[in-house]
Regions:
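Extracellular beta-strand/beta-solenoid scaffold signature
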Residues: 93-102, 120-129, 144-154, 169-185, ...
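Acidic Gly/Asp/Thr-rich repetitive segments characteristic of extracellular carbohydrate-active
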Residues: 33-72
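Extracellular beta-strand-rich solenoid/capping regions of secreted or surface-exposed proteins
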Residues: 58-59, 70-83, 91-134, 148-155
Length: 309
């Protein structure tokens, strides 16, 4: 025997089912100076630290800082965006000897509007060792770390974008990029970056003993670094190329330095008041498009001049 069930009953049952469904999905969560890590990380009840918020958000979700404060170091093990609201300074101070941000995940990681302060005791500002990752670092300030400001050492393929970012006053390099495994590729762009006063290293250092790296640097400035403004080094053949346009190196030991089997190309770039403006070492390749400016005209090695087009 069939019993007819009124549609209003079915609708009520369906509504109740939805109402009792688990509400665990968190595509966007929040932190604030007045937050508490026992909160659910909503806008009305934000968390206190970035780490708790990252733990709470879904993979691929977003963590937003509502107001200016220090929100603690982060270990990132999922795809995530970490950003600050407009006008907010979202600070991260690591524990002594630790990193401000450690990235060890596949997928996309996007960091925007963060201020990483090492206080001359933190190790790296941003440390990445993961594989098959896309990383974006935008409008960030990274300073006073004992080692590198940004250390990208992927164990697989990596696509990177570093935009409008400052890496300064660190103990070693401002930005270092080093693929770790044979057959892997690191590709990306550094645009409007400032790397300066890095004490014992280089503003931007791209190096490899195994994988390939193809990096474009545009509209950037590297100055007052202890060793080199922008440097490349490879021991594995022609798989490392850094292309520069509208980029300035100044007041470094060497402005542009290519070593090993690496290659550099220059267009509409400037080297001024470096100990040596351009140094192309044995086996390295330097290509100039003829529209660059060397203030002191000091060039070591051979530059290949290409026709402008």
């Amino acid at each position: 025997m069939r019993i007819a069930v009124p549609m209003t009953v079915l609708a009520t049952a369906f509504t109740c089912t939805l109402a009792t469904a688990p509400a665990h999905a968190r595509g966007r969560v929040f932190v604030a100076s007045y937050g508490n890590d026992s909160n659910p990380c909503t806008f009305g009840s934000p968390c206190k630290t970035f780490q708790n918020a990252v733990n709470a958000v879904d993979a691929g979700g977003e963590v937003t800082a509502i107001d200016s404060a220090g929100f603690g170091p982060i270990n990132i093990t999922k795809a995530v965006t970490i950003t600050s609201s407009d006008g907010v300074e979202a600070g991260i101070v690591p524990t002594p000897g630790g990193n401000a941000i450690t990235i060890n995940t596949t997928g996309d990681v996007f960091l925007r509007g963060l201020t990483l302060e090492g206080e001359n005791s933190g190790y790296d500002g941003i440390s990445l060792t993961s594989a098959d990752t896309v990383v974006g670092i935008v409008h960030c300030v990274i300073r006073h770390f004992t080692h590198d400001g940004i250390a990208l050492l992927p164990n697989g393929n990596l696509t990177l974008s570093i935009l409008n970012t400052i890496a300064s006053n660190n103990g070693n390099d401002g930005i270092t990029i080093t693929p770790q495994l044979p057959g892997t590729n690191v590709t990306g762009v550094i645009d409007h970056a400032t790397t300066s006063h890095n004490a014992n290293g280089t503003g931007i250092y791209v190096t490899s003993a195994s994988g390939n790296a193809f990096i474009t640097i545009i509209n950037s400035v590297s100055s007052n670094n202890f060793n080199y403004g922008i440097s490349t080094y490879s021991t594995v053949g022609p798989g490392l190329l850094v292309t520069m346009r509208d980029t300035v190196t100044a007041h470094n030991k060497v402005g542009f330095f290519a070593d090993g089997n690496s290659a550099m190309t220059f267009a509409h770039s400037t080297a001024i008041d470096n100990g040596n403006d351009v140094y192309i070492n044995t086996n390295a390749t330097g290509v100039s498009y003829g529209d660059n400016h060397l203030a002191t005209k000091v060039v070591s090695g051979t530059l290949i001049h290409q026709t402008l087009f």
